[in-house]
Amino acid sequence: MYTGVYRDNVLVATGLVLIKRLPLSFCMYYLPRGPIMDYKDKELVQYYFDQLKKLAQKDHCIFIKFDPAIHVNDYDSKSYNTNRYKETELYLDTFKSCNAIHLGYTTSISDTVQPRFQSNVYSYENIEKVLPKHTKRLIKDADRRNVQIIHGHLELLDDFSRLVELTESRKGVALRDKSYFKILLENYQDGGVIFLATCNVYKLNEDAKIKKVKLEKEIAQTCENAKKKLHRLEDQLRSVDKDIKEFKEIFSEFGQENKDIAIAGILSIQYGNTCEMLYAGMDERFKKFMPQFEPLITEVTKFLGTDFYRNLSYQAIPAVPAVIFVVS
């Protein structure tokens, strides 16, 4: 159910209401990330909930749950703290005046419909210079395997959906399907984008076979007394043989062709001055290619400075609300 409040023919408040039917003709309402309005406007907040409660009574709704996207704090991932912005208490008091009950700043994901914490990558000039050493190393690992990052729209949907399905199977979770992603991209034609990490396994296999021949030749030419060197070369040969075996398994599915294969992906949506990474998927067989988050997120963040993402302040890596309320 869509709800809204107009003032002088201008929409000043809105909220998506999800309705869950319960036994005995009862139900519950849930407003994800809402309602959306100026929470400092106490009169507007009060009016919205008064009208919503009237609808709820007619619908035999036993309670209303909502988690407005209130920005309560910022801190570095290594410096957790429980500070709150001054406006937070003002918003809490406004909601409480509408008989809402604040359920607290829970840190357990099982207590909420959606998680509370959100990781942000802020837009920087020359972002490569501020990356952690660990991230730079992972990017180098991906570069050594010729992992490339491409971006597009509906033309990349098939590959992205396949990667999400693989993630669902691996994690035992239910995400969204191709039709849902298609709706997102169609509705955000100017703000939706799919990023894919790709690699050419055919070329990697050819390089591995050349390296195998070179190692075998070097082992044959190495003196038996040079045990340390032999051990190192044999370890490298075993690693190359393992890679070739894995490439063969991949060829059985994708065919042994000289082409790029999508191995990880992210679907992002631009809204206002932010960009939300909504969904991600990866082919586990390529995990040592390091295509997943660090290189992809870095490339997406670098992309914030292009014409596609104009004036973005940060990129969110999957989203979260700050507070949970119940109105009874």
Indicate residue ranges for each PLM-predicted region.
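Acyl-donor binding region in acyl/amide transferases
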Residues: 26-111, 272-328
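A conserved beta-strand-loop-helix scaffold within acyl/acetyltransferase catalytic domains
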Residues: 1-25, 71-73, 78, 86-88, ...
